[in-house]
Amino acid sequence: MNINYSELSSSRSLSVIAPAKINLHLEVLGFRKDGFHELAMLMQSINLFDEIDFLKTDNGEITLTSDDPNLSTGDDNLILKAAQLIQTCSSDKNVGAEIHLKKNIPIGAGLAGGSSDAAATLVGLNSLWGIGSSEKQLEKLGSELGSDVPFCLRGGTQFCFGRGESLEMIPEIKQSMAVVLVKDPLVEVSTPWAYSKFKEIYGNDYLKMEEDFEKRRQSLRDASWLNPLNCTNPPPLQNDLQKVIEPITPAVRNALEFLSSLEGVLSLAMSGSGPSCFGIFADLNGAQIALEENRNKLKLSGLDAWCCAFKSSGVSLRL
């Protein structure tokens, strides 16, 4: 769904869908002066999403509740940070909101659940409070909250460069493709720790110059498998972080072993900093059949699993 970001809501309540993402490509190029890593990524939205309900109030206060008792609803939550940030853009200092999160994306899974929730909050309150910020303005705000937030706002299939906030569209891909996504529910991986571990092991090989960064970006742009990206030409998935996470994380190895056993899987990889892993299928029906045929094996593995179609957009208003 395309959102008119300047559209003002006449209602006192609305809901926003916040989809997860996977990394079809994640390449660590080097280290930036601002302390972040320089990345070359291809990210894809999938049809696994959180739902966030917003109710407008007039007391200037912002509150957050969730159906997940394990989720912090304090000031460290990106939803509250996003709400407080966009509240500063409103000319009405009395605007407030009661926010409720229905959590479906697993936490600490490399799926940008927190970033997508932040993006959904920017979109929801931009409309509910009548602020009228444009897509570019919201993406700029989002980049202050996290590197993945701009992608989550736009969604679909995007090149993500810089620390992840610099987006470039790619030619339209075959949206009928789908994934089986799996994760050990007892395991989380810290994204900062994953990058720190990668730097510790591979830092001596980092590129140093902008012209070298750009050569790697262009190499990704020119990759033959992107045109077309479809079931006859699946992507040769690459995730540099997998090189450091997989050897020391049994949950990742277990997930990849399970996925590799599924009939019809085209390619597989870890997403983001993990521990979630995914296998790509030609279509959703094929993914569902493959998973259903392996329910007993899935139960024995201790993994949670989802079948998710590729999604052509990011956060969207719930109609």
Swiss-Prot record:
Reaction(s) this enzyme catalyzes, per UniProt: 4-CDP-2-C-methyl-D-erythritol + ATP = 4-CDP-2-C-methyl-D-erythritol 2-phosphate + ADP + H(+)
A Pfam family annotated for this UniProt entry: GHMP_kinases_N
Coiled-coil regions listed: none
Pathway: Isoprenoid biosynthesis; isopentenyl diphosphate biosynthesis via DXP pathway; isopentenyl diphosphate from 1-deoxy-D-xylulose 5-phosphate: step 3/6
Binding site residues for ATP: 106-116
Keyword RNA-binding: no
GO MF annotation: an example: 4-(cytidine 5'-diphospho)-2-C-methyl-D-erythritol kinase activity
Keyword vocabulary terms for this entry: ATP-binding, Isoprene biosynthesis, Kinase, Nucleotide-binding, Transferase
Transmembrane segments: none
EC code: 2.7.1.148
Keyword Kinase: yes
Active site: 21, 148
Gene Ontology terms: biological process: isopentenyl diphosphate biosynthetic process, methylerythritol 4-phosphate pathway; terpenoid biosynthetic process
NCBIfam families registered for this protein in UniProt: ispE
Family under the similarity heading: Belongs to the GHMP kinase family. IspE subfamily.
Function: Catalyzes the phosphorylation of the position 2 hydroxy group of 4-diphosphocytidyl-2C-methyl-D-erythritol.
Protein name: 4-diphosphocytidyl-2-C-methyl-D-erythritol kinase
Species of the source: Prochlorococcus marinus (strain SARG / CCMP1375 / SS120)
